[in-house]
């Protein structure tokens, strides 16, 4: 019996485990995403593939060959959430006062108020749906989780992996505000943001944007949004 030569074959071994990092924009979600990547690479090395996707159509080619998929999302589809559960993955969630999130987007990424409000409202609605149905490891921006070394150990524990304290400290120190600013500067010089970087440019691997590091202020919306905007 003749057999067709397959153009694409199913990889050997188990399917990749999916780690889903969900969050409102400007909630520290990219910091958490990078911590997850670094921790998993300590254990699995090159077997970790990381990217942004809200649905399957956004998956890069070849992801099925990874050992672990780390996916950053702001508005994950139901099927993506199910995939995480199906692969016995883990979901992380980062939250922030929505008005501060909007104010930060306007300051750092030059977003207009109406567009930022519409986007934040849509993301928040989807996140509320997931939060009501799924167990997630949740961090709030207001608690300053990104400034605590202990957060790295908590994330490793949630992932179910053992990472040496020295490696955890190295990861933490590589993701302080100053270090991330330096990294963003290097990405800019290397051309990772393109020839003419703007507020919407980003690095595919880390998801850092040119203006990603903010001032971390809580309640900043009071000085950025008008009284009418604050009530919307």
Where would I find each of the regions flagged by the language model?
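Amphipathic alpha-helical segments that form well-ordered structural scaffolds
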Residues: 35, 39, 126-129, 154, ...
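Aromatic-acidic/polar surface patches that form glycan- and anion
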Residues: 14, 24-25, 29, 84, ...
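Amphipathic alpha-helical recognition patches that constitute DNA-binding helices
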Residues: 20, 31, 90, 171, ...
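A structural signal for well-ordered alpha-helical segments within the folded catalytic domains
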Residues: 26, 30, 34, 96, ...
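C-terminal accessory extensions appended to soluble enzyme cores
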Residues: 209-232
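Short, flexible turn/loop "capping" segments at secondary-structure junctions
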Residues: 12-14, 130-133, 213-214
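PAPS-dependent sulfotransferase catalytic domain
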Residues: 45, 68-207
């Amino acid at each position: 019996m003749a057999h067709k030569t397959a153009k694409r074959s199913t990889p050997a071994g188990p399917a990749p485990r999916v780690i889903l990092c969900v969050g409102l924009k400007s909630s520290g979600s990219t910091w958490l995403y990078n911590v997850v990547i670094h921790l998993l690479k300590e254990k699995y090395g090159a077997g970790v593939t990381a990217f942004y996707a809200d649905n399957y159509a956004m998956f890069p080619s070849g992801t099925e060959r990874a050992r672990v998929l780390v996916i950053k999302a702001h508005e994950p589809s139901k099927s993506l959430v199910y995939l995480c559960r199906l692969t016995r993955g883990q979901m992380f969630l980062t939250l922030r006062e929505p008005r501060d999130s909007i104010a930060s987007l306007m300051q750092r990424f030059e977003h207009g108020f109406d567009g930022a409000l519409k986007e934040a409202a849509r993301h928040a609605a989807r996140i509320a749906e997931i939060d009501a149905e799924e167990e997630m490891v949740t961090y709030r921006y207001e608690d300053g989780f990104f400034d605590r070394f202990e957060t790295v150990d908590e994330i490793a524990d949630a992932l179910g992996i053992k990472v040496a304290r020295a490696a955890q400290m190295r990861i933490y120190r590589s993701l302080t505000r100053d270090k991330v600013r330096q990294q963003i500067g290097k990405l800019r010089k290397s051309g990772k943001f393109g020839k003419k970087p703007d507020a919407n440019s980003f690095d595919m691997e880390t998801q850092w944007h040119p203006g990603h590091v903010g001032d971390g202020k809580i309640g900043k919306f009071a000085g950025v949004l008008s009284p009418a905007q604050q009530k919307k």
